[in-house]
Amino acid sequence: MSQNQDRKDNDVITLVDDEGNETLFNILFTFDSEDFGHSYILLYPADAAADDEVDIQAYIFNPEDGDNGELQLIESDDEWDMVEQVLNTFLADDGGMQ
């Protein structure tokens, strides 16, 4: 899956799937993990309504790739556990995504 960052608003990116379909996503936040040596990006659909339950997606990314970098799938259960802990902490501190 590739990432194409919208130059007008750095909080929105377009993901292009293997079939060429484009979907807009808002960036919830990014963070780095020294333990796993990766940077992570957490996204949710740009068309999600404020009162909807939102499907948050997480990927590994390389911030040095710029606007057209490739997002990588998180394959390790240990990495997923860490990402979920970071997300839960973010949501608890932020009071949700409101």
From Swiss-Prot:
InterPro entries, per database record: UPF0473
Bridged cysteine pairs (disulfide): none
Sections of the chain in a coiled coil: none
Superkingdom of the organism of origin: Bacteria
Pfam families (UniProt xref): DUF1292
PANTHER family hit by this protein: UPF0473 PROTEIN CBO2561/CLC_2432, UPF0473 PROTEIN CBO2561_CLC_2432
Family the UniProt entry places it in: Belongs to the UPF0473 family.
Name under which the protein is recorded: UPF0473 protein lp_2273
Source organism per UniProt: Lactiplantibacillus plantarum (strain ATCC BAA-793 / NCIMB 8826 / WCFS1) (Lactobacillus plantarum)
